[in-house]
């Protein structure tokens, strides 16, 4: 890899770290091509991705923002999983690591400055995604309106049943 390619890789990694909500750092040693492809497909379904990175280039892309903690993350054969939101890549990586013990979660990087350990990444994976939170919020907002509409319509429905009862009584 010559200097131009290295610089291009560093710029690519800088954009990954800048655009991703969180980056999950994993050791992938021992994964077969089929297993890695399965992981890539799962991540792609959620709009996330995984990329095998060279440790020195990843550290240069972070410009030393992580200090010694970052040096500990990027050792050995490293792949980074990342996505547009902070939760999706972490959820899929943790789930895959549970199913396949060859993938090891090392830690993560949150907002280019905060280093997460393995427990932090696992905790991040338990959080609801942004879409799930939006759905819950909309449900909470709509619930009172639905109840009010039901209460307001109830007297009219009861009155209609009373009139119907009188009409059937008179007809009989």
Swiss-Prot record:
Domain of life of the organism encoding this protein: Bacteria
GO CC list: large ribosomal subunit
Pfam families, sorted: Ribosomal_L10
PROSITE patterns with a match to the protein in the record: RIBOSOMAL_L10
GO biological process: translation
Keywords: Ribonucleoprotein, Ribosomal protein, RNA-binding, rRNA-binding
Transmembrane segments: none
Single Gene Ontology MF annotation: structural constituent of ribosome
Subunit and partners: Part of the ribosomal stalk of the 50S ribosomal subunit. The N-terminus interacts with L11 and the large rRNA to form the base of the stalk. The C-terminus forms an elongated spine to which L12 dimers bind in a sequential fashion forming a multimeric L10(L12)X complex.
Task performed by this protein: Forms part of the ribosomal stalk, playing a central role in the interaction of the ribosome with GTP-bound translation factors.
Family: Belongs to the universal ribosomal protein uL10 family.
Name the UniProt record assigns to this protein: Large ribosomal subunit protein uL10
Name of the gene: rplJ
């Amino acid at each position: 890899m010559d200097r131009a390619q290295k610089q291009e890789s560093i710029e690519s990694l800088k954009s990954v770290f800048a655009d991703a909500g969180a980056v999950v750092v994993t050791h992938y040693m021992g994964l077969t091509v089929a297993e890695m492809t399965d992981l890539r497909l799962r991540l792609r379904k959620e709009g996330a991705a995984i990329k095998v990175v060279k440790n020195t280039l990843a550290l240069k892309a972070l410009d030393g923002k992580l200090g010694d903690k970052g040096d500990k993350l990027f050792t050995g054969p490293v792949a980074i999983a990342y996505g547009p939101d902070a939760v999706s890549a972490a959820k899929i990586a943790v789930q895959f690591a549970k199913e396949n013990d060859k993938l090891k979660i090392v830690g993560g990087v949150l907002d280019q400055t905060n280093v997460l350990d393995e427990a932090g990444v696992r905790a991040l994976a338990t959080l609801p995604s942004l879409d799930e939170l939006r759905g819950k919020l909309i449900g909470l907002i709509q619930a009172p309106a639905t109840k009010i509409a039901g209460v307001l319509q109830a007297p009219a429905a009861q009155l209609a049943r009373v009139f119907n009862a009188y009409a059937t009584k008179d007809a009989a």
